[in-house]
């Protein structure tokens, strides 16, 4: 994959709630990585927890509204929403897809979601931002060749087992990338 100039890579950064607490190293390493690669992350300070799939157990409307708000925060910056959490990417990505489909198939539902956002003084969801995982941005936007050139300490010979999280690779029909 060819690289894009790193100076053009800007994202609305959604760290998620776990990276602010139990996995602070994830937040810190993402900050250090983005700085080293020249990727600009505009942190969405007013973002809410995505609900990690639990909101929809109570109400699909709740999950869609909370995450439409998060996406709308990125849309106000005219940037794609970027997260490093596979669960956040999965939940927010599915909401984004569901609301984009609602624009065509069920505009009344989208009006309901945006009405709830408006009641809270939030910008409406428009479906213009998109949701990316950090790994997708590194591979697809930054490029593997450019990334390889930045390696300062190769880990050749290191045997490891990667765990990306299930939402990063499944459900395949809902993801913008091939595994």
Residue ranges of each PLM-predicted region?
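Iron-sulfur cluster-binding electron-transfer modules in prokaryotic oxidoreductases
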Residues: 2-179
């Amino acid at each position: 994959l060819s690289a894009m100039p790193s100076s053009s890579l800007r994202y609305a950064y959604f760290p998620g709630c776990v990276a602010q607490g139990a996995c602070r190293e994830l937040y810190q390493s993402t900050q250090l990585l983005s700085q080293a690669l020249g990727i600009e992350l505009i942190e969405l300070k007013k973002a809410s927890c995505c609900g990690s799939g639990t909101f929809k157990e109570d109400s699909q409307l709740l999950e869609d509204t909370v995450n439409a708000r998060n996406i709308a925060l990125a849309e106000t910056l005219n940037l794609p929403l970027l997260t490093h959490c596979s669960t956040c990417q999965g939940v927010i990505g599915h909401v984004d897809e569901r609301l984009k489909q609602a624009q065509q198939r069920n505009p009344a539902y989208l009006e309901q979601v945006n009405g709830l956002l408006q009641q809270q003084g939030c910008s409406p969801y428009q479906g213009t931002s998109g949701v990316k995982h950090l790994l997708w941005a590194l591979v697809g936007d930054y490029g593997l060749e450019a990334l390889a050139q930045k390696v300062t300490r190769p880990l050749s010979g290191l045997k490891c087992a990667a765990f990306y999280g299930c939402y990063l690779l499944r459900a395949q029909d809902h993801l913008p990338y091939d595994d």
